[in-house]
Amino acid sequence: MHHGGGGGAIRVLNVAEKPSVAKSVAEILSRPSGGMRSREGRSRYNRVFEFDYSIGGRACHMLVTSVTGHLMELEFDDRFRRWHSCDPADLFHAPVRKSVPQDKQDIKRTLEEEARKCQWLVLWLDCDREGENIAYEVIDICAGANSRLNIWRARFSALIDREIHEAVQHLDRPNKLFADAVDARQEIDLRIGASFTRFQTMLLKDAFVLDDTGDDRNIILSYGPCQFPTLGFIVERFWEIQAHEPEEFWTINCSHTSDEGTASFGWIRGHLFDYSSAVVIYEMCVEEPMATVQNVRNQEKLKYPPYPLSTIELQKRASRYFRMSSEHTMKVAEELYQAGFISYPRTETDNFSPNTDLHSIVHEQVAHPNWGTYAQRLLDPEARLWRNPSNGGHDDKAHPPIHPTKFSAGETNWTDNHKKLYELVVRHFLACCSQPAVGAETTVEIDIAGEQFNASGRVVLAKNYLDVYRFDSWGGTLLPTYIIGQQFVPTTLTLDSGMTRPPPLLAEADLLGCMDKAGIGTDATMHDHIKKLLDRCYATKDANTRFSPTNLGEALVMGYDEMGYELWKPYLRSMMEADMKSVSIGTKSKSEVLENCLQQMKACFLDARANKVKLFDAMGTFFARSSRPVNETQNSIETVRPCAACNESEMFLKQRPTGEFMVGCRGFPQCRNVVWLPRSLSGAAVTDQVCPTCAPGPVYKIQFKFRRRDIPPNFDVDHLGCIGGCDDILKELMELSRFGSHSQTATPARNQSQTASGVRQGSSRQDLHTSFHPAVQFTNGQTPVVNPQGFRSTHTQSSGNASGQVQCTSCREPCVLRTANTEANRGRKFYKCQNLACGFFAWEDDVENSAPRGRGGRGRGGRSSSRQSSASASAGRRGGTQGRGRRGRGRNADGMMFVAATGEPVYGSCFICGDPTHFANVCPNLGR
């Protein structure tokens, strides 16, 4: 046999999705030419098969090899792959790339080497969207090695001779839209999953004891956009059961026994929850117990066979009939498909094409010992059992419904589950082609004392499809004969009570139905989402295949539910799935769907992060707090800017256990650069807005929320600010707010006043609440008078001295005059103590209104003096700076220097023990 491909033969590289499929395709196509030869490729698991064949009358030398599922992986650039390398919010827009992982490099090399020697590339990947995406991964590799390749797509639904030969003789072009839809889904899932997973894990893992054994350091609290709505169905049903309060009800039951049997009549009202009303009606019936037959209805009823078998129905029925998990069902179905016994098991289609030769498929089953006789009857025209399958209304345009493709009485290597699933597929197919079952149903209605009761009975006249489909039953009871007007006294007439019951936990078939109805996942991925919930310990499944949430699963759903965001509901994912379907049919572009979905989910992410306390509260309901060092708990890691001190790491926003906010370098402890934010903050979150002024950048703006009691009344509590030094409003707010122990300057000199010393050495906790109406003294020595606003003012006796200077009564130092730059108070003057640790503040006009003015009013000289004092004080504060965030050898060299959010250095040491390596709030001697 000639294998060289000479004589004008076209060399054709055929690529299948799995090695077993490649072997089956090669065996089928090589039979006419007398066989094939096999050799190893670069990967020992993916062999290359060679043989001669004819396509469209043209001689071809065929080379058949395979990949093993997806050849490429989508991943973030290296600088974003480490968990602490970036703010999780950055992952919504971080660069991604698709590349061949190391463990598949051998497959890649095989494809490249073979592609260089071929003229055609024929893709035998699974004929669904996922398979089309893998096909384009193969195209990228092969076309990169040989750009002149003529690329074709083989479309098939079963690994049988007829299908494979038909596919290779009617080659098509690959569908880029299908591949784009999968690309969009992969990128959306990667970005959403990675961002929420990092957020949840870093926020909660080290903060709580999640594992009773204590070995929970490697736990990943994953979030998946399909996985979480699936968990939501389980939790929602669980909550519904927990919220159910049993309620007693009462109903009247009646029975009548005659020579023909017993009939049980039910009350038309069903039941009543009011006992008194039920007793009154029951007593009426007991007093007048004669029953009168008011109506007798006899009608023919039909029970129709099921629709042709789709993937979701296969999973649901296997779960219901055999208690097989959806994940195991798909594994067994895939093995049956690859062995050629059933058609492709991943399909949404539930109607057969008119061109399908259904009789031939039935004919293959006539030899089976269990259902062969039924198959013969089905093909017999005189039996009148044949009926074309019903149309279920779904067609994915890729594959037919699941049906048998090869006869088997049971292979020696089959497990019980292989036998059960093959039997289900065959019996389901035979049932689809059968007449419905026929029954005669009788309904009898009676009246007792004005109350209506009825009873129903059924007799099956022709079982038809029920003869082969043993999984369905259609029983009934035979009623005695009644005629209209007949009267009788009931044999029993009772008032019975019962209790309402909650719905049961979701079974796997029910869960699959919920997912299918809500559009969560696809027929090929639903089982995988369920498996992940079990693997991640978010849910458990009992022996009856019913699901319950674990404490961890319930806590996460509860946390998001408390936020008010329906991230655990199916609506968002359902919209995404609809968008991806739109990409696959060309009504929306991949870029459009990516932009819309990621923009929506990033907004949800930022909102969730801003309300992370809800997650903490929910987790605290189920889990004990961890005793691990708080430094390991990454409660909030949000990148603000590159560190200008070490030029190596990022600076990030973090909230300490005490509630304070800081911006520190990730390079700690090698780099100790830190910005202490004021303790008047109640919240802070980094936004995605970049400051256009500050460098080195990017410098992300922070959304600050101040406590109203700790800032002047005319400032907004919400402020979008920049810590890079350009934000004048933020500087004012910083200067007007107490910093507590973190912002204290060097230890006060001995010659300072006792008042000032007292302020400095007071409790760092008691000193936080700044009064914005403190005492005021003028330097002209006048006696202060307290005004209604709480200020002290001095009455001037002469106009020439009317502009007395404002003095801080705590520090006894002249105040500086500043100008507000906020929207509400732009241009308004205020007095501020020169001492950064002092919280003195007063509006200029309030001070003026509290004291009589001379005819000349305040002179300009006073303002000039204040400005000079302000400039001098500011210059004095800057004098000792020797770099940001480093320990300096300038003023107070024995202490530590930090950078305040105003951009100015802050020196200090612990005022309790004098240690320069920490401040008093973390001093081990605190409280002794």
Swiss-Prot record:
Domain of life: Eukaryota
Ranges of biased composition (kind: Polar residues): 741-765, 777-806
Note on cofactor: Binds two Mg(2+) ions per subunit.
EC number: 5.6.2.1
A GO BP entry: DNA topological change
Region (Disordered) residue spans: 389-410, 741-806, 849-892
Zinc finger boundaries on the chain: C4-type: 643-671
Keyword Metal-binding tagged: yes
Annotated Toprim domain residues: 11-157
Zinc finger annotations (CCHC-type) as residue ranges: 909-925
TM segment ranges: none
InterPro entries (UniProt xref): Topo_IA (IPR000380), Topo_IA_2 (IPR003601), Topo_IA_AS (IPR023406), Topo_IA_cen (IPR013497), Topo_IA_cen_sub1 (IPR013824), Topo_IA_cen_sub2 (IPR013825), Topo_IA_cen_sub3 (IPR013826), Topo_IA_core_domain (IPR023405)
Coiled coil ranges: none
Cellular component terms per the entry's GO annotation: nucleus; RecQ family helicase-topoisomerase III complex
Residues annotated for Mg(2+) 2 binding in this entry: D126, D128
GO molecular function: DNA binding; DNA topoisomerase type I (single strand cut, ATP-independent) activity; zinc ion binding
Residues that, per the record, bind Zn(2+): C808, C811, C833, C838
Cofactor (UniProt): Mg(2+)
Family note: Belongs to the type IA topoisomerase family.
Role of this protein: Releases the supercoiling and torsional tension of DNA introduced during the DNA replication and transcription by transiently cleaving and rejoining one strand of the DNA duplex. Introduces a single-strand break via transesterification at a target site in duplex DNA. The scissile phosphodiester is attacked by the catalytic tyrosine of the enzyme, resulting in the formation of a DNA-(5'-phosphotyrosyl)-enzyme intermediate and the expulsion of a 3'-OH DNA strand. The free DNA strand then undergoes passage around the unbroken strand thus removing DNA supercoils.
Subunit (UniProt): Component of the RMI complex, containing at least TOP3A and RMI1.
Listed name of the protein: DNA topoisomerase 3-alpha
